[in-house]
Design a protein with these regions (language model features):
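Short "lid" loop at the C-terminus of a central beta-strand within the Rossmann-like core
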Residues: 250, 267, 284, 313-318, ...
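SAM-dependent Rossmann-like transferase core, predominantly class I methyltransferases
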Residues: 116-119, 127-195, 200-202, 208
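Acidic, low-complexity/disordered tracts enriched in E/D and polar residues
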Residues: 2-78, 133-140, 163, 400-505, ...
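Mobile active-site "lid"/loop adjacent to the S-adenosyl-L-methionine
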Residues: 262-293
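Conserved SAM/SAH cofactor-binding pocket of Class I
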Residues: 169, 177-262, 268
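Flexible, glycine-/basic-rich loop-and-beta segments that form/coincide
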Residues: 349-441
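Long, charge-rich, low-complexity alpha-helical segments
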Residues: 75-120, 126-137, 184, 196, ...
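Conserved Class I SAM-dependent methyltransferase catalytic core
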Residues: 221-222, 287-343
Length: 552
């Protein structure tokens, strides 16, 4: 177990008092213009980029120069020094920056603590009298765009490695991270009556779900995480979220939801003494068993037609089918549900171990890093694991409409069951992938309910982000390769032959697929039935991928 000190306690026991203080804090943050854009303007693009890499020196130098020039920091700079850079600031300057909350209010909330006499930048007073304060929690702005527009929140979490100066504690509550932003971007923006956020952490998934859901139940195994999640909900004025303590689906036994979203603690961690068990990423199971458990149990907690979206890892084991092993295992776990699993990355076990040891704040080149590295590799070797996949999982419980789709065409043909490896760069998705996923699901359901005769009668248009590429050898009139490229979504590139290229090019919403196929058969001097048998499945695929859309 970790020997790091426990995180600072959250000191406000009375919720009404905490709500009052958080309201004052909100007013102060607005007054200081404590926003992403203002911070980047304060210290510049280079320093902002360095902060994203975990380096604060460039930003600190900018603020140090400002202090030398002006003698004291303005409100925005004070908050930036304190909460973003993790350095102590004079109590008097923080009092000005938090005029409504006050320093005592910030201490009562657990945001800051007394850093001791004369620690941090001086305020011009006697060194024996001057006092400074230091952040006890991380607080920073978070800006995003989704299908409903752009918005900005403030996110409270535990201090990160940069501010702590040492490895994280096991009870650490993570703030905005790559995984939480990925999941938030994947969420379907379609309205939902009741949503479950499984493993909410500091509350970011639940907050995003509030953009499209009437009611949300957010659970976590960490009581501290739920306390911080409540702070974030109140600070940002978000209602309709119920917080429950417990592991996985235990807090919602017997309940069903229209939507489940989850960034579960899926990181594969050795189950041996001395390896830190971080609440925010370690579910306490062996290997990828936690992801399997979430996928298998989701069925019982989804309403008919309900959808679950989660992130996860899966193991590739030697002698178990090579590339078919990891992703196919996920397909087996999801067999009771319609599913769309997209693998985005595969790491060798050495890369995986390095990533997550470093994530906890243990520095490479130290004896502790090497000890943990051995533990990870021993654990993988014991199960014959060679690589680890990471990706997105979308699950859907069948409803009456799904049954109708299955009976409208060949048995099972209308069922969503996709396992994909899409390891390349994504397309441009300013509002996240969620809107693209929602469109693909809707179009899939529509085409899956049509037999080939009905599909041939349908009219399509090419999606607005799709372009065609043709490659030529110098001097040749005929292309050597043709590609259909998706600008948004997953940035797919589909190889085209002459027939499919011509069909896509003619799909302007005026002619049916059948009419286009008939004209092409005459032009290419081929059998119309054979050409239709070749092109209609390709049309279904392009519809599923979001590259062709129904014209009406």
């Amino acid at each position: 177990m970790s020997t790091e000190p426990k995180p600072s306690p959250l000191t406000v026991a009375d919720e009404a008092r905490a709500d009052e203080l958080l309201g004052r804090l909100r007013d102060d943050l607005v007054a200081a213009d404590f926003t992403v854009a203002a911070l980047e303007s304060l210290w510049g693009e280079d320093a902002a980029a360095a902060l994203h890499r975990g380096e604060r020196v460039p930003a600190r130098r900018v603020l140090d120069a400002r202090r030398r020039e002006h003698g004291a920091s303005a409100g925005l700079a004070t908050l930036a020094e304190l909460f973003v850079l993790g350095v102590a600031v004079p109590r008097g300057e923080l009092s000005e920056a938090l005029a409504r909350l006050g320093v005592d209010g910030a201490i009562e909330l657990g945001l800051v603590g007394d850093a001791g006499a004369a620690e941090g930048a001086g305020d011009g007073g006697d060194s024996g009298v001057a006092t400074s304060v230091r952040a006890r929690l991380d607080l920073r702005p978070y800006a995003f765009s989704d299908a409903y527009g752009s918005a900005e929140w403030w996110i409270i979490s535990d201090l990160g490695e940069l501010a702590l100066g040492h490895a994280l504690g096991e009870q650490h509550v993570l703030g905005v991270g790559g995984a939480s932003m990925t999941l938030s971007g994947l969420m379907l923006p379609t309205p939902a009556r009741r949503v479950l956020d499984l493993g909410t952490g500091c509350g970011i998934p639940a907050m995003h779900a509030s953009r499209f859901a009437d009611r949300i139940v957010a659970t976590d195994i960490s009581e501290r995480a739920l306390e911080i999640a409540r702070l974030n909900l109140v600070l940002n004025g978000i209602d309709g979220v119920e917080l429950r303590l417990g592991s996985l689906f235990e807090p919602v036994a017997g309940e069903r939801f229209d939507r489940i979203v989850s960034n579960p603690p899926f990181v594969i961690t050795p189950r041996i003494e001395g390896v830190p068990e971080y609440d925010y990423r370690d579910g306490g199971m062996v290997g990828d068993a936690l992801v399997e458990a979430v996928i298998r149990e989701a069925h019982d907690h989804l309403e008919p037609g309900g959808i679950a979206q989660l992130l996860g890892n899966w193991e590739y084991r030697e002698g178990a089918g090579g590339d078919a092993d990891g992703l196919e295992r996920v397909g087996d776990w999801a067999a009771a549900l319609e599913h769309w699993v997209i693998e985005r990355e595969v790491q060798h076990v050495t890369e995986y171990a390095e990533t997550w040891i470093r994530d906890g704040g243990t520095k490479p080149g130290t004896a502790e890093f090497d000890r943990l590295y051995d533990a990870w590799l021993d654990d993988f070797a014991a199960r014959g694991v060679e690589r680890v996949g990471f990706g997105y999982v979308l699950l859907r419980r069948a409803d009456a409409a799904a049954s109708a789709r299955s009976t409208a065409v060949a048995a099972g043909a209308g069922r969503l069951a996709r396992l994909e490896r899409l390891h390349g760069p994504l397309g441009a998705n300013e509002a996240g992938l969620g809107a693209h996923l929602a469109e693909c699901l809707a179009e899939h359901d529509r085409q899956a309910g049509l037999d080939d005769t009905a599909l041939a009668a349908a009219r399509f248009t090419t999606a607005g982000d799709v372009t065609e590429e043709r490659h030529y050898w110098p001097g040749d009139d005929d292309p050597t390769a043709m590609l259909l490229r998706q600008g948004g979504g997953f940035g797919r590139a589909i190889s085209l032959d002459t027939g499919l290229a011509a069909l896509v090019g003619a799909s302007d919403g005026e002619l049916s697929v059948g009419a286009i196929v008939a004209a092409l058969a005459q032009l290419l001097e081929v059998d119309e039935t054979a050409l239709a048998a070749e092109l209609l499945p390709a049309v279904r695929t392009l519809v599923d991928d979001g590259m062709l859309r129904f014209a009406d």
